[in-house]
Curated annotation (Swiss-Prot):
<feature type="binding site">
    <location>
        <position position="191"/>
    </location>
    <ligand>
        <name>substrate</name>
    </ligand>
</feature>
<feature type="active site" description="Proton donor">
    <location>
        <position position="74"/>
    </location>
</feature>
<comment type="similarity">
    <text>Belongs to the diaminopimelate epimerase family.</text>
</comment>
<feature type="site" description="Could be important to modulate the pK values of the two catalytic cysteine residues">
    <location>
        <position position="209"/>
    </location>
</feature>
<dbReference type="GO" id="GO:0005829">
    <property type="term" value="C:cytosol"/>
</dbReference>
<feature type="site" description="Could be important to modulate the pK values of the two catalytic cysteine residues">
    <location>
        <position position="160"/>
    </location>
</feature>
<feature type="binding site">
    <location>
        <begin position="209"/>
        <end position="210"/>
    </location>
    <ligand>
        <name>substrate</name>
    </ligand>
</feature>
<keyword id="KW-0457">Lysine biosynthesis</keyword>
<protein>
    <recommendedName>
        <fullName>Diaminopimelate epimerase</fullName>
        <ecNumber>5.1.1.7</ecNumber>
    </recommendedName>
</protein>
<comment type="subunit">
    <text>Homodimer.</text>
</comment>
<dbReference type="InterPro" id="IPR018510">
    <property type="entry name" value="DAP_epimerase_AS"/>
</dbReference>
<feature type="site" description="Important for dimerization">
    <location>
        <position position="269"/>
    </location>
</feature>
<feature type="active site" description="Proton acceptor">
    <location>
        <position position="218"/>
    </location>
</feature>
<comment type="pathway">
    <text>Amino-acid biosynthesis; L-lysine biosynthesis via DAP pathway; DL-2,6-diaminopimelate from LL-2,6-diaminopimelate: step 1/1.</text>
</comment>
<dbReference type="InterPro" id="IPR001653">
    <property type="entry name" value="DAP_epimerase_DapF"/>
</dbReference>
<feature type="binding site">
    <location>
        <position position="158"/>
    </location>
    <ligand>
        <name>substrate</name>
    </ligand>
</feature>
<feature type="binding site">
    <location>
        <begin position="75"/>
        <end position="76"/>
    </location>
    <ligand>
        <name>substrate</name>
    </ligand>
</feature>
Amino acid sequence: MIQFTKMHGLGNDFMVVDGITQNVFFSPEQIRRLADRNFGVGFDQLLLVEPPYDPDLDFHYRIFNADGGEVENCGNGARCFARFVRNKGLTNKNKIRVSTSAGKMTLRLERDGTVTVNMGVPVLEPSQIPFKAKKAEKTYLLQTPQQTFLCGAASMGNPHCVLDVEDVANANVAEIGALLTKHERFPRGVNVGFMQVVNAGHIKLRVYERGAAETLACGTGACAAVVVGQIQGKLDQQVQVDLPGGSLTINWEGEGKPLWMTGPAQHVYDGQIQL
């Protein structure tokens, strides 16, 4: 039997598994089965806590999408990861350092129950996103057989494409997201953000996630949207990001600096399941 915890960050939900005190391995097929909301646990991502590879760090953090594929980063998951390792007694620290397949992150448990995550420095160089473009630009033209889109692009350890929309509530997220997430100019696929700028300190955002379709919240997507919005001269240093599942606060001092994301992490229940 595998012990697990169900958690969510703004409705972006996770199955969190302690891979330190129990020996676990998940095949892509097992993950797909567990992710099924009718026949399994049901989640957007599975989060796996592993021992650190680096003695200066506290944990290694792995993320698997509902389709079974491993991904580089998940901001909402990082907040739940921090709350989980603390609640389970795997650490007594308030400041937790972890590695992911994309790099290192610092997670900070706040007194009010929220978690602040150092999301790292955004990557804007196209080849590193990865995105096929000759050089970094504030906006790019993305052509499809149906229409041409204006977008910004950035990586937060995972690739993001951000579109400006006038009214996010009526944006065609499912259709356009499905069209762009596999666009040939993003060799590893891309998460697609639909951003409505309310004012310089406030945006509304919906995200079509690579491998998971639209989710209620996407932490890296919120960060990427703020980066693109700032670069395009539309946003301030601190921005409230309203997602369908709730709000995050993103702080970015500009190019070369890390982003800080603050938001909630909720425990739903503990369970056990036979693989």
